[in-house]
């Protein structure tokens, strides 16, 4: 499969690209490759028996080398009399059928339709040095003459650096004439960027403009990009799309050259896309470890992230990837994330597919013939099974998928595709049913099963969920906050009223429902699609103790606060995300922590109750403001940071005299856990409530 790189936004900025052009200077116009570097594209688009016109031939050896391999019907023109004289003398006896003529390419003397190919190596670039009117008029005359002397079906093959203004002019001119436009990257030009002293800093392209017979009234325009020597051309919809595709190739080439010369460029990421569909297939992150002492075998490695685990901190966050690279012990580590919706046959096929591309990102100084290792967790690519995909009018596109963890256990995840790197909800599948599959699916799968796929896939039924297991660390901390209630050792026998805003997959309210038999829970969810997801895929169900209200949490609490006989809750939990990624606070939406609204929350909380809030805020100033606002309404405020995540769990109470010292708080957590650990009742042995509270701090 052909893989096309697409640079990340960091390398698409105007400032970055402008700086590059300032450093380029004029040297780039002076070299476009030898015959050996261009022969692949030349032989692809020129047949040996065709009549070829070379415009602006100069003293290049290109025509001579083409002649020597069988392309002998070649006419060369140049405006320089000195050059033409030199070339005639150099070729008169050895290449008698090749001619050299002094001629202005904007006023050629050949009859119409004299040639099948017009070959231009850098001449258009040399003429089109700016966009002044005089220059553009000269280029118009040149291109018009090219069109005149070419036969229908003939090609204008122009070797160019494809700077934006040159590409725009050439593509615009010939597409308006109804010609087919193709841009083909010269494969060897990428290698030149990795030389110790490259002769230019841009990849070389060939424009192949094919002359079609004019059709009156036809608006058909054909634009294609061929980004690899043997790759299939990709059809594009517009000249703008073609220009963008070329720009991405140039940016990628520049990125490769910079990575070759320098370490520690900062956060560098790019997508490798399916060459046929354009869909992202791999996401690469380049991580340098300057402190690693170089040796022969530790220069460069590739780490394949198992499918479905790209959201984990170690792989999904920059700090995590730095830790991974340091522990791996290589100067440069490239992490590779596999995309859902793509088929992968196994580690060997991925290695074969990626080898050429990742070597373009290698650092300088690697020993010759060094075998670059491909690493992974457990030596395989993991398992990801997409169980369901749909679109919610409120939350957008989402996916339900089952992924295999470290211990071969399966986990079900809800992911909003608007934020692919965040797991919205997660649940563990029960081991005894995690490998059941419907017979039809098994039968279909036997026809074609990729490597590293288990014989049986996880069952789709919601009943396969392990309801005793909390996957999310912030959910574990929120449950531990119930130890702040009076007499936690008696909570299983105490009627508890809880309000949970934000349902997601339903794991949090479901855990409370199953472990606190006297609890009565009201869950509020704005998106009806999420109730459907929780019910069908995460084992959630309503009962006389569990009611779900489809409503905006703001409206629901406001309405309760305005009731004369308003209810009072022992526990209120906010686990609700914001749909606006620009705010600096992704959980909860800012309106949920506004002073006026917090007063309403306070009015429906029992005097000794606890308000528990999942806060995700990267803006430190905004976070300080939120904490100050909470403190103004709830005098007692505990904060528990979730290690390796941005999440902070806030425990808010109404009376500061209820403040507990850490030893006292831990003792209450142990008492609650001892009560919850009942014989015959499922419990995760790794879940220790006191561990969730031992780093709690009072604000």
From Swiss-Prot:
The listed locations are:
Cytoplasm; Nucleus; Mitochondrion
Which residues in this protein are found as N-acetylmethionine? Answer: 1
Which Pfam families does the annotation name? Methyltransf_31, Spermine_synth
Q: Where is this region: Disordered?
A: 433-460
Could you say which EC number(s) this protein's record lists? 2.1.1.-
PANTHER family (alphabetical): SAM-DEPENDENT METHYLTRANSFERASE SUPERFAMILY PROTEIN
**Similarity comment text for this entry:** Belongs to the methyltransferase superfamily.
Function, as annotated, reads: Dual methyltransferase that catalyzes methylation of elongation factor 1-alpha (EEF1A1 and EEF1A2) at two different positions, and is therefore involved in the regulation of mRNA translation. Via its C-terminus, methylates EEF1A1 and EEF1A2 at the N-terminal residue 'Gly-2'. Via its N-terminus dimethylates EEF1A1 and EEF1A2 at residue 'Lys-55'. Has no activity towards core histones H2A, H2B, H3 and H4.
| Name used for this protein in its record | eEF1A lysine and N-terminal methyltransferase
């Amino acid at each position: 499969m052909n893989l096309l790189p697409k640079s990340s936004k960091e390398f698409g900025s105007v400032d970055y690209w402008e700086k590059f052009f300032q450093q380029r200077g004029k040297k780039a116009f002076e070299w476009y490759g030898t015959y050996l570097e261009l022969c692949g594209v030349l032989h692809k688009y020129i047949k040996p028996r065709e009549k070829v016109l070379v415009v602006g031939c100069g003293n290049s050896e290109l025509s001579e080398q083409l002649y020597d391999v069988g392309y002998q019907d070649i006419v060369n023109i140049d405006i320089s009399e000195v050059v033409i004289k030199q070339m005639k003398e150099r070729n008169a006896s050895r290449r008698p059928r090749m001619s050299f003529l002094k001629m202005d390419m904007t006023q050629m003397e050949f009859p119409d339709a004299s040639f099948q190919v017009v070959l231009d190596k850098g001449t258009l670039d040399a003429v089109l040095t700016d966009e002044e009117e005089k220059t553009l008029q000269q280029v118009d005359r040149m291109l018009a003459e090219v069109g005149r002397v070419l036969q229908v079906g003939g090609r204008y093959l122009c070797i160019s650096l494809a700077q934006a203004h040159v590409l725009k002019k050439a593509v615009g001119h010939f597409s308006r004439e109804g010609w087919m436009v193709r841009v083909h990257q010269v494969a060897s030009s990428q290698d030149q960027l990795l030389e110790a002293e490259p002769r230019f800093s841009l990849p070389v392209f060939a424009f192949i403009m094919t002359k079609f017979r004019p059709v009156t009234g036809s608006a058909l325009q054909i634009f294609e990009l061929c980004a690899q020597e043997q790759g299939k051309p990709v059809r594009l919809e517009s000249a703008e799309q073609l220009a963008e595709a070329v720009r991405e190739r140039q940016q990628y080439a520049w990125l490769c050259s910079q990575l070759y010369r320098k370490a520690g460029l900062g956060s560098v990421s790019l997508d490798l896309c399916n060459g046929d569909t354009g869909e992202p297939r791999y996401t690469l992150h380049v991580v340098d470890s300057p402190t690693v002492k170089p040796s022969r075998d530790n220069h460069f490695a590739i780490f394949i992230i198992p499918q479905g685990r790209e959201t984990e901190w170690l792989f999904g966050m920059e700090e995590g990837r730095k830790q991974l690279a340091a522990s791996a012990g290589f100067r440069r580590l490239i992490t590779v994330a596999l995309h859902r919706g793509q088929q992968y046959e196994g580690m060997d096929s991925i290695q074969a597919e990626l080898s050429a591309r990742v070597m373009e990102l290698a650092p300088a100084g690697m020993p010759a013939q060094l075998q670059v290792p491909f690493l992974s967790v457990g030596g395989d690519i993991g398992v990801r099974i997409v169980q369901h995909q749909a679109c919610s009018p409120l939350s957008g596109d989402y996916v339900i998928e089952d992924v295999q963890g470290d211990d071969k256990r399966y986990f079900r995840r809800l992911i909003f595709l608007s934020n692919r790197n965040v797991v919205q909800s997660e649940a563990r599948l029960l081991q005894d049913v995690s490998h059941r599959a419907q017979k039809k699916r098994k039968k279909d799968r036997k026809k074609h099963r990729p490597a590293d796929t288990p014989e049986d896939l996880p069952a789709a039924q919601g009943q396969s969920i392990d309801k005793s297991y909390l996957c999310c660390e912030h959910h574990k901390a929120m449950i531990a906050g119930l130890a702040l209630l009076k007499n936690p050792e008696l909570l299983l026998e105490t009627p508890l009223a809880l309000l949970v805003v934000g349902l997601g997959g339903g794991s949090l309210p479901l855990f409370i429902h199953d472990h606190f038999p006297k609890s009565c829970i009201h869950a509020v969810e704005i998106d009806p699609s999420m109730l459907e997801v929780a019910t069908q895929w995460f084992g959630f169900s309503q009962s006389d103790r569990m009611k779900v209200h489809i409503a905006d949490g703001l409206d629901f609490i406001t309405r309760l606060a305005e009731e004369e006989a308003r209810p009072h809750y022992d526990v209120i939990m906010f686990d609700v995300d914001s749909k606006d990624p620009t705010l600096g606070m992704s959980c909860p939406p800012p309106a949920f922590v506004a002073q006026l609204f917090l007063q309403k929350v306070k009015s429906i909380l029992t005097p000794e109750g606890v308000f528990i809030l999942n806060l995700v805020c990267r803006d430190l100033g905004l976070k300080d403001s939120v904490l100050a606002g909470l403190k103004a309404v709830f005098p007692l405020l505990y904060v528990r940071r979730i290690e390796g995540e941005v999440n902070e769990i806030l425990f808010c109470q109404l009376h500061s005299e209820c403040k507990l010292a850490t030893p006292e708080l831990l003792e209450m957590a142990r008492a609650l856990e001892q009560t919850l650990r009942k014989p015959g009742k499922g419990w995760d042995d790794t879940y220790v409530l006191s561990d969730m509270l031992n780093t709690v701090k009072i604000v």
